[in-house]
Amino acid sequence: MEVPLYNLQASQVGNIELPPQFNEKIRFDVIKRAFLAIQSHKRQPYGASPIAGKQHSAWTSKRRRSWRTSYGRGISRVSRAILRRHGALFYWVARNIAQAVKGKKAHPPKAEKDWYEKINKKERRLAIRSALAATKELDLVKARGHIIDKPVPIVVDGLEQLRKTKEIQQLLLKLGLEKELERVYEIKRRAGKGKRRGRAYIERKGPLIVVNDYNEQLFKAVDNIPGLDIEEVPNLNVELLAPGAKPGRLLIISKDALETLRERKLFF
């Protein structure tokens, strides 16, 4: 499949053939599995204290005796804490068990649980190829919410030469992505408790820019535009190509990065 090739002035200078990675069958199930695996690698372990709900001085004899026993009292044989007493007469309540007030939880989350999900190497590569193939389907790109009416992905020659945020914005405007930029610049304040849990604002995902080599100035310039991401072509993953496990992200890739995909046979 051929797509238009643009220069830094957003003028079409020819066509370019997409590498075989873009011809993969789109597997939504594999993409989701790879995405969830990446998300699990970021999950922080959590759990209750091992002694939570077990710190009361509560004990009841299970034998037939006269002192502190539950036999012959018409009460269940559970651990009990004495709140007050008069001789051998106790006012005591159940403690240290799941059904009791101030008791432990029956099956609390364990801090030692391993949340890390593994995925086969070939399966991960298949997911990346599937996500790349989805970027050339205009219907999937529009279904993600991107506003574009030209063939995708967008291939730009010399993309690595840009250094300033203003230059990147001008290129995107010349490529006809003015409405797309307006969409990602609109940031909404989240409804609900997420506001006080470190995710107060909802940020839309815009285009993904893929380059051949790392350049600090270029990467910082892209970071200044909300919703945009940038990555080197060997470091691509499903989370970047299909945020939320939904494939079809708008892809802007440099010509050199496309040739690197072809020559190095990445993700095969």
UniProtKB/Swiss-Prot annotation:
GO cellular component, as recorded: ribonucleoprotein complex; ribosome
PROSITE patterns noted in UniProt: RIBOSOMAL_L1E
Source domain of life: Archaea
UniProt KW Ion transport keyword: no
MF terms in GO: rRNA binding; structural constituent of ribosome
InterPro entries referenced in this protein's UniProt entry, alphabetically: Ribosomal_uL4, Ribosomal_uL4_dom_sf, Ribosomal_uL4_euk/arc_CS, Ribosomal_uL4_euk/arch, Ribosomall_uL4-arc
GO biological process: translation
Pfam family, one: Ribosomal_L4
UniProt KW Hydrolase keyword: no
Keywords assigned by UniProt, alphabetized: Ribonucleoprotein, Ribosomal protein, RNA-binding, rRNA-binding
Subunit structure: Part of the 50S ribosomal subunit.
Similarity field: Belongs to the universal ribosomal protein uL4 family.
Matching NCBIfam families: rpl4p_arch (TIGR03672)
Function: One of the primary rRNA binding proteins, this protein initially binds near the 5'-end of the 23S rRNA. It is important during the early stages of 50S assembly. It makes multiple contacts with different domains of the 23S rRNA in the assembled 50S subunit and ribosome.
Name this protein carries in UniProt: Large ribosomal subunit protein uL4
Species name: Nanoarchaeum equitans (strain Kin4-M)
Gene name, Swiss-Prot/TrEMBL: rpl4
